[in-house]
Amino acid sequence: MSSIQLQKYLDLLPENAILNAGIAIAGLSAAYAIGLVIYRLYLSPISKFPGPKIAAATFWYELYYDVIHKGQYFHKIEEMHEKYGPIVRINPHELSIRDPDYYDELYVSGSVRPSDRYEGFVNGVVDFEGSHLATVAHELHRKRRKPLDPYFSRAGVNRLEPMVADLTEELVVKRFEEFKGTGKVVRLDHAFTAYSGDIISALCIDEPPHFTSTPDFTPSWFDLFHSGVVTLPLFMGLPWLIHLIRLIPESILAVIDPGAQNWNTFRMMCYDSIKDTKREKGAQPTKDTSLLGRPTLFRHLVNSDLPASELSDERLLREAQVLIGSGTMTTAGTMCFLVYYIKSNPEIHRRLTEELKPIMEGYPHKKPSWAEIEKAEYLQAVLKEGLRLSFGTIHRRPRVSPNQPLQFKEWVIPAGVPVGMSAYFQHTDPKIFPNPHEFNPDRWLSNVTPAMKKNYVPFSKGSRHCLGMNLAYCELNYIIATMFRPGAVDFDLFETTELDVKPTHDMVVPLPSLKSKGFKVKFN
């Protein structure tokens, strides 16, 4: 319609009609907003639960602390619990519980009751729809996770162990010893992200990226996940932004956000691998994957009996992105945390190296197995303390009981209401862990109480516990044992403080201070 024709129709409208229409729309919008607030405050199924009225009325309260204050709503929730008690309403839809005795009641196996994921959480997780992690319904999640479990079980990771051992040797012996005597400053957060990325990629796809062997450990790989995680609170608060961004052509998006190219490169790495695996399947007359090459998770999935809808390129692409992304960043962050506290505490360093002497003797010509490394009691205490204080995730993990209400003390939580608990609260309860913010491996060597074991939840619990738990333990055992064995290459912390490793921001994935210039060490 031309501007002349549009003006013709506008001239036919009564005087002030456009103004009146605008006023009417504004009035209806205001009435809707007021009605919504009244419903949330007084008529909602969770209106009787304690908590600040502003949090019950609007999501903007949470968005303010997580976007403007960069992932600080978990501290606000902590304040709410201090004021209102063990159960609080933290937004219009969701409850938070802080009670060490209730964790095992909320995070249960599928045989106890189904546990759905909170749809509001899933909607803001960028580009992961269709993956097991972003699946809302319990039964569909179970079907999607079942074929993944064997690859991440203890037995599955044991089969992967030789590759983990070889990559550890490549990083710590080949790469780090190149720097011996050079005084070279290295970003360990880049090195560990490359290492973990190579391991999880080798498990999933046929051609891992070999980031560990690149000169500077491919900083763009670290930047890809770090920059993506920083945006998560915004997208979780305003999920419609994701759909808006998808309307922008990739060529324009690359100009607006240069980091988008890293994401596209990652997507294409996953997509190309999946397409190659499908082409391989089409050319192979048998389902025997042992004839196809190195066993990988996605070779197994493509050749499985899953329905065609579960094997679409797009769904498998997103599953690959989730598995590789989540298997890279949190494990690398825990490695940085552990190395910092070991190097910052000479007595911990000394005891650890002394214990590792008989186990790592002859390395790398004689490599100990993961099971042999696990016999080092002090090392296991160090790892547990590192996982306790790096939390896995700080963010509460909301669960929904779709069919039956939950009972918490005198409170009946209606079916369908998302309820979350946080490893941060479980791991920093002073009644369970005295001086909870102190890095003290000795707490795991004597007087270990049942409450300590019960409330140690870096990988969560229940039917949706962290898939990569065994792989993370394997990597942590190998990397710490190898770096701190007697005779390992010597290095010192360089322009690095606790702020560079300590979880400070809850961006769903915990991050250290956003002012950090990276975790750096200098090789002597």
Swiss-Prot record:
UniProt main location, coarse: membrane
Q: Where does heme bind?
A: 466
EC top class, as a word: oxidoreductase
The question of whether Nucleotidyltransferase is a record keyword is answered with no
Describe the reaction catalysed, as an equation: ophiobolin F + 4 reduced [NADPH--hemoprotein reductase] + 4 O2 = ophiobolin C + 4 oxidized [NADPH--hemoprotein reductase] + 6 H2O + 4 H(+)
* UniProt-listed InterPro entries: Cyt_P450, Cyt_P450_CS, Cyt_P450_E_grp-IV, Cyt_P450_sf, Cytochrome_P450_monoxygenase
Keywords from the named record: Heme, Iron, Membrane, Metal-binding, Monooxygenase, Oxidoreductase, Transmembrane, Transmembrane helix
**Which co-factors does it depend on?**
heme
Membrane topology per the record? Answer: Multi-pass membrane protein
Q: Which CDD domains match?
A: CYP58-like
Q: In its UniProt record, which GO terms are filed under biological process?
A: terpenoid biosynthetic process
What's the Enzyme Commission number for this chain?
1.-.-.-
- Tell me where in or outside the cell this protein is found: Membrane
Q: Which domain of life is it from?
A: Eukaryota
Q: In which pathway does it act?
A: Secondary metabolite biosynthesis; terpenoid biosynthesis
The UniProt entry, under PANTHER family, shows: CYTOCHROME P450, N-ACETYLTRYPTOPHAN 6-HYDROXYLASE IVOC-RELATED
Q: Family, per the entry?
A: Belongs to the cytochrome P450 family.
Q: What does this protein do?
A: Cytochrome P450 monooxygenase; part of the gene cluster that mediates the biosynthesis of the sesterterpenes ophiobolins, fungal phytotoxins with potential anti-cancer activities. The first step of the pathway is performed by the sesterterpene synthase oblA that possesses both prenyl transferase and terpene cyclase activity, converting isopentenyl diphosphate and dimethylallyl diphosphate into geranylfarnesyl diphosphate (GFPP) and further converting GFPP into ophiobolin F, respectively. Other sesterterpenoids (C(25) terpenoids) are found as minor products of oblA.
Protein name in UniProt: Cytochrome P450 monooxygenase oblB
Q: From which source organism is this entry?
A: Cochliobolus heterostrophus (strain C5 / ATCC 48332 / race O)
Q: What is the lineage of its organism?
A: Eukaryota, Fungi, Dikarya, Ascomycota, Pezizomycotina
